[in-house]
Curated annotation (Swiss-Prot):
One of its GO terms (biological process) is DNA replication. Belongs to the activator 1 small subunits family. RfcL subfamily. This is Replication factor C large subunit. ATP binds at residues 50-57. It comes from Staphylothermus marinus (strain ATCC 43588 / DSM 3639 / JCM 9404 / F1).
Amino acid sequence: MPRRIPWIIKYRPKKIADVVNQDSAKKQFIQWLESWLKGKPSKKAALLYGPAGCGKTSLVEAAANEYGLEIVEMNASDFRRRQDIERIAKTAAFMRSLFARGKIILLDEVDGISGTADRGAIDAILHLLEITRYPVVMTANNPWDQKLKPLRDASLMIAFKRLSERDVIIVLKRICQLEKLECEDAALREIARRSEGDLRSAINDLQAIAEGFGRVTLNWVRELSAYRTREYAPFEALQKMFNARYIFQAKSAISQANIDYETMMIWINEHIPTYYDDPEEIWRAYEALSRADVYMGRIRKSGSWDLLSYVFDMMGPGVAFARKIYRYKWKAFRSPKRLQLLAQTKRSREVREGIAMTLAPRLLTSRATIKRDVIPFLKIIFTHAPKYAAKIALGYGLTEEMIKWLAGPKSSEVLAYYRRLKR
C-alpha cells in the first residue's frame, strides 16, 4: 500500500507567489535575501514572526526553491543547547553545498528556546550571525519575550499577519479540486472558522475528514474538527479584547494571551488612554483594571486561585465594555515603556540585589534594610573616599561589578586601590 503524503507537505508552496497573502512580508524578505546574494545585506539575519500556520517557514522554503538555494534547517525546540547550535549551524555557515549552491540557514521556532534550560543558546546564535557566510532566517510565533531581545536587535524583523477565513477557504477549495474531493462550501467555511487563520491546522482537518469519510460535509466537520486552544501574542490579545462584541470573547482573549497575567495588566494599563478617547470610558476602564489588581493582590496573599476568574472578568470584559457603544477600532499596540525601562535596568537591579544578599548576613539585618538604609551611604563613601571604599569592599567580599556599581564615575580609582590591597 503506497505511503500517504500529508497534504501540508504535498501542497506546500513551491513558488513565492503560492504563499497565501503576506504581500508585505514577501516583499521585505525578498529584498533582504537579494541583498545577501549581492553581498551587501543590511542585517545578517531575518526574524519572521507571526501566528502559527501563516506561512513563515513556507516562504523560506519557496524562496530557496526559486533561487536554487539549499536549506539547512534546525528547530530550536529540538536543538537547544549551545553546543548543538554551534556544531550544526557553524558547520553549515562555513561548508560549501555539495552542489556548489548557496544556502539559507533556517532556525525554526526560536521562541522555543528557554531562558534558563537553554542557557547559552542565544549567545551561540549571535556568534553564528557574526561569522556566517550565508543568510540566517529565524522564525517565531512570539518574538517579544525579553530573552529574545538580542536576536531582535540583530535581525530584520518581518511581520506575518494572521490569515483571514477567506484566505484559508481559497486554499482548501484548491486542494479539494486537485484531490477530486466532494466538499460542501459550508463545511470549508466551518473548517476555516475553527482554524482561526492557522492554514496548517485547517489542511490537517480537511485531510483527516476526507480520508476518513471520502467527502467533507458540514456535519462531519462539526463532529470531528476540533476547536484548538490558541495562544495570542499580547498585540493580538489586546486587539481581540478591545474589539470584542461579547463578554466571552474579551475574557478568552485575556486568558489565552501568551504572557503572564501581571504582565498583561501592564500592557492594558498603558494602552487604555491610547485606545479610548472619552474621559468617562477611560475612567471606567481603569476602575475595572484596578479591581483586577485588587483580586491579584488577594491571590498573592492568600493563594486563593479560584479568584483568578474574577481577574479575567475585570481585565477583559471590564475594560472592553467600559465603552459606551461598540465601535471597531484598529490600533497598533506597542511594548509598554515600563517593561522597556525594567529591561534596561535589569542588570543594575540584579547587582543591587547581590550587594544586599552579600551584606545582610554580615550586618545581621534584612536585605530590605540594606537596600533602604545602607546602600545610599555606601554610594557616598565609594564616590568620595576611594581608599576607604576599597577596604570596605575587600572586607565584606564585594565583587568588582558591585564596586563599579557603587562607585560610578570613581570606579577606576576604587578598583585600583582594591586590586592593590588584594595582592
